[in-house]
A protein has these predicted regions:
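Loop/turn elements at helix/coil->beta-strand transitions in domains of secreted/extracellular proteins
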Residues: 12-18, 33-34, 56-61, 87-94, ...
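An alpha-beta-alpha
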Residues: 42-93, 219
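Short, well-structured alpha-helical segments in soluble
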Residues: 8, 108-127
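Periplasmic-binding protein-like
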Residues: 1, 16-21, 62-65, 125-136, ...
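Extracellular/periplasmic periplasmic-binding protein-like sensory domains
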Residues: 85-93, 140-219
Length: 219
């Protein structure tokens, strides 16, 4: 709906600058109306996430998503690159489906599904498997169960140390707010305590946070 929203704004106020950070619409669609549209390099990440998973020790890669997300150009293209990267690097690519948190089951239902399914997936595919999901609300239960049952986690779809980790490991970051080195240090400590050392990763800074600052500066 962002593209249509921008279009309506421009009809009434063409002088307003419309900036899109991490838009869900296809790049060519949102770019037709936005003054600037910024998204992470999903093409490179499609390869780099799989490559990093292999360096961490993974032999299989499980991509978890649902039809709505897979209809997006950026997500489906990244998934296709991940599949090819697995083939090139000698890893097995596996696609698993999870409930859409915007469906009738809601966020709670989707998270409960993950809590129940992740242990079964680890048992089925082995602890030498890396898991990746396209939805931010699914990272928390995924991290929690991987710490407990095994498996690898390279990074979140919207990479950031505050996506998934605080909720999964009960990390209070109120005192560290805005201090990314301090946040990363506290998250790392919690991951090690939970048994995820060497099996879990993230970016040093929040992609969304940096994206927003950049758009405000450029706008």
């Amino acid at each position: 709906g962002t593209t249509e929203g921008f279009r309506r704004v421009k009809e009434k106020r063409p002088d307003l600058i419309c900036l899109a950070g991490e838009p869900q619409e296809d790049p060519n669609v949102i770019s037709s109306v936005a003054d600037m549209s910024v998204i992470e390099d999903f093409i490179s990440r499609g390869y780099l996430i799989v490559h990093t998973a292999k360096k961490m020790g993974a032999k299989k890669f499980v991509h978890i998503s649902f039809p709505r997300h897979m209809s997006y150009e950026s997500i489906s293209r990244r998934a296709a690159i991940m599949q090819q990267a697995c083939k090139d690097l000698g890893m097995k690519y596996i696609f698993e489906t999870a409930p859409d948190p915007t469906s009738d089951v809601g966020v709670a239902g989707a998270q409960q599904f993950m809590l129940e399914k992740v242990p079964a997936w680890v048992k089925k595919y082995g602890k030498d498997t890396a898991f990746f999901t396209t939805n931010s609300s699914l990272h928390e239960p995924l991290l929690r169960q991987l710490a407990k049952f095994g498996g690898y986690y390279v990074e979140a779809t919207s990479a950031s140390p505050i996506v998934g980790y605080p909720g999964a490991f009960n990390i209070d970051l109120s005192k560290e707010a805005g201090d990314w080195p301090a946040i990363l240090k506290k998250v790392e400590k919690a991951v090690i305590k939970a048994g995820g050392a060497g099996r879990m990763g993230t970016w040093a800074y929040s992609h969304g946070y940096a994206n927003t600052l950049a758009l405000v500066y450029l706008g």
